[in-house]
């Protein structure tokens, strides 16, 4: 591990100890028995990190990538090569989004492995994947019409509806629930579950005090602020408050010197600085938004978007931006 450390890579109070990213089929060991693999995504965010944990005579996999032929081929390459044909004992998914859960069912079936996931995300994932092929509900149309969507935007929403499950292999019919403070033993070491909310309903991070490693999923990412959106399924929810509360809680229970292994970008040190930046970023946005909303505004108004986002909002990110805008309002 130490040969790959580059202590001088530092920015915004964060330190990135690895000067290279994993190549196809060649994971990098970031801590004893903890390996970082990287897979391609067909989205604007073009990659996901998945984590391989050595577990006696086999492996534990944390997060899985989307269900596509290229992703399956990447896993097959790892099985035959780096993983040495050894069994996978457990598949653990941090949360319900397709880039994390997409191949969980396939991996579990392939190895007859145990499947671990939080209850809320498991059930929500099955519900949303079950919408495939269904007609858009009137509640959704009413929700986005109230947000300011015009007929063209509503048509695009209708066309998108039911697409959540297109890159998700059917989930296992049974799972092992993970919840706050649960402990999972892997290779003789205890990994504690730390739950966050806001980006996903019940996002599970894995923290190992002995290794001083936090597998953070999308809950803490060094150079991306995870999307926090309000959806028509819970129109009176407050996911942004959930997110900020989760950041405060994690800062209080996880030490600052932990190695953070995120789902995107690179492993880093500086957990508390990053959590502070995430909290401050949203609170500053709320302050500016309060000023802008002295006059009536819609969630999708340009002035609202300009307060919340540094980039121009195009069609490819419009729905995510609208959801985040609604969460802030």
Task: List where the protein language model places each region.
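C-terminal regulatory/interaction regions
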Residues: 1-16, 287-329
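N-terminal amphipathic/basic leader segments beginning at the initiator methionine
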Residues: 4-34
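Conserved beta-strand hairpin/beta-sheet module of binuclear metal-dependent hydrolase folds
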Residues: 24-86, 206-222
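Short Pro/Gly-enriched beta-strand edge/turn motifs at strand-loop
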Residues: 30-38, 160-167, 187-189
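Metallo-beta-lactamase
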Residues: 59-69, 164-175, 183-185, 190-286
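Histidine-centered divalent metal-coordination motifs
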Residues: 94-100, 199, 203, 264, ...
